[in-house]
């Protein structure tokens, strides 16, 4: 692993970790290939991202916008770290939260047909520093759609934090402002990332097996 502006870069030949080295729910034992990013590493990286966010955005009211459903764990943990920094700083700022749901996946493919559910009234974003928190950037089309929607409400600033960015030839070239990990073009689950709503209850980010894909296929 190496570190650069795109976060912790996980190489294409990263072997991951054997499942039996971690506590994995028994009902998923045959459905995963390996643990890709252990929970502890996720938390340590998230703590640093919180500091980076406050450094760039901490001078004005922040509205943290969570992209559901996959982003909720990263959102909650990132905000916990941000709140800790905020309450221990002489220059603390107010922070509010909002939620939006986007749907673009069926099975393991981004459909390109992006549905926005919720977020009908985002007028509260006007004049605010908006931090959009997402679980994963795949092609980037979903985030481009959301950014267009958010910018209609004239926020003062918009930044995007994504736990994961996938290296894929399908990418439109969009890169978020804050990145936890840059990963190979593999379908990952866990830490609230799902495959047809399954695997959100895993603590670690894992690579799904072909058995798992077949079992939970829509």
UniProtKB/Swiss-Prot annotation:
Mg(2+) binds at residue 194. InterPro entries: HGPRT, Hxn_phspho_trans, PRibTrfase_dom, PRTase-like. Keywords: Acetylation, Cytoplasm, Glycosyltransferase, Isopeptide bond, Magnesium, Metal-binding, Nucleotide-binding, Phosphoprotein, Purine salvage, Transferase, Ubl conjugation. Its EC number is 2.4.2.8. GMP binds at residues 69, 134-142, 166, 186-188, 194. The active site is at 138 (proton acceptor). Pathway: Purine metabolism; IMP biosynthesis via salvage pathway; IMP from hypoxanthine: step 1/1. Pfam families: Pribosyltran. It is found in: Cytoplasm. It comes from the Eukaryota. It is an enzyme of class 2 (transferase). It catalyses: IMP + diphosphate = hypoxanthine + 5-phospho-alpha-D-ribose 1-diphosphate; GMP + diphosphate = guanine + 5-phospho-alpha-D-ribose 1-diphosphate. Its cofactor is Mg(2+). Converts guanine to guanosine monophosphate, and hypoxanthine to inosine monophosphate. Transfers the 5-phosphoribosyl group from 5-phosphoribosylpyrophosphate onto the purine. Plays a central role in the generation of purine nucleotides through the purine salvage pathway. PANTHER family: HYPOXANTHINE-GUANINE PHOSPHORIBOSYLTRANSFERASE. Belongs to the purine/pyrimidine phosphoribosyltransferase family. Homotetramer. This is Hypoxanthine-guanine phosphoribosyltransferase. It comes from Canis lupus familiaris. The lineage of its organism: Eukaryota, Metazoa, Chordata, Craniata, Vertebrata. The gene is HPRT1.
């Amino acid at each position: 692993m190496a570190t650069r502006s795109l976060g912790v870069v996980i190489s294409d030949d990263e072997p991951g970790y054997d499942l039996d080295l971690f506590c994995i729910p028994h009902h998923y034992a045959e459905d995963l290939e390996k643990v890709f990013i252990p929970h502890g590493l996720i938390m340590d990286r998230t703590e640093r991202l919180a500091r980076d966010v406050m450094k760039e955005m901490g001078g004005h009211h922040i509205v943290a916008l969570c992209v559901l459903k996959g982003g909720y764990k990263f959102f909650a943990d990132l905000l916990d770290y941000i709140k800790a920094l905020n309450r221990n700083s002489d220059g603390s700022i107010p922070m509010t939260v909002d939620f939006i749901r986007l749907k673009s996946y069926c099975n393991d493919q981004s459909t390109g047909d992006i549905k926005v559910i919720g977020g009908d009234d985002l007028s509260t974003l006007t004049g605010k520093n908006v931090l959009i928190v997402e679980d994963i950037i795949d092609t980037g089309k979903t985030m481009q759609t959301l950014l267009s929607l958010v910018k209609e409400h004239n926020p003062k600033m918009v930044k995007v934090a994504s736990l994961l960015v996938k290296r894929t030839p399908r990418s439109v070239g969009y890169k978020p402002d804050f990145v936890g990990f840059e990963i190979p073009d593999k379908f990952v689950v866990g830490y609230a990332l799902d495959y047809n709503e399954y695997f959100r209850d895993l603590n670690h980010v894992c690579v799904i097996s072909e058995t798992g894909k077949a079992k939970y296929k829509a």
